[in-house]
Amino acid sequence: MIHPSSIIDPNAKISNDVVIGPYCVIGPGVELGSNTKLHSHINIKGTTKIGKNNEIFPFVSIGTPPQDLKYKGEKNSTIIGDNNKFREYVNINPGTSQGGTITKLGNNNLLMVYCHVAHDCNLGDNIVLANNVQVGGHVTIENNAIVGGSCAIHQFSRIGSLALVGGMTGVLSDVIPFGLSLGNRNNLVGLNLVGLRRAKISNKDIKLLQNFYNIVFCNQNFRSNIENLEADMKENKYVKIIIDFINSDKKRPISLPENIK
């Protein structure tokens, strides 16, 4: 069902059961998957592919040119998976040639009011961005992460799986998987124990992660502490996720406790 006040380019690919409310504008390069609902006043442009069962609320803008002065009109795209909810005034920009030309969001994500996802970002699945989270260019947010309201995330930063970032945090450094990070400039303050329990990770593994945290992040020179870990701790699959995250990308520093270097 398409409201007669909406403007749909004839070259757009719209599944038969998509609902498009009043005053929406859909460009020629847009694909909308089955059972997706657009409430009203939504602008989707560019080469934008949106999957199934998404719900998009009023005044959302997706696929308009990236806010990057280096962007010169090169081809780019935005790819969004299934079962996402984008609340009012969410803005998602496509990629640039400096970042692979693609912005990607996975499945089952909730982006609350006024969230911005900049060019070349890569967001996984089951992520929650609370109201007014501002995600800079080239940012990676892994599965099941939660970012509190009014956070600003510096370009090229990474937030690991099942991490929790407290509200109004300025994220300048990478947040480890399962980490809890907050503050004016994000400091690591512990593990996201609530998230770990909700994910049904065993008490044994949670205790081992706590021991890992106390060994690595409660003493100076955390990288040397990792090298000196006992073999059985390094082999734990959750510890390995954190170590691989730390070793995989060094564009931004790792978020650490305030007194650790």
Predicted regions span which residues?
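Structural signal for interior beta-strand "rungs" in well-ordered beta-sheet cores
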Residues: 1-187
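Terminal amphipathic alpha-helical/low-complexity segments used for targeting or macromolecular assembly
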Residues: 1-5, 10-11, 16-17, 53, ...
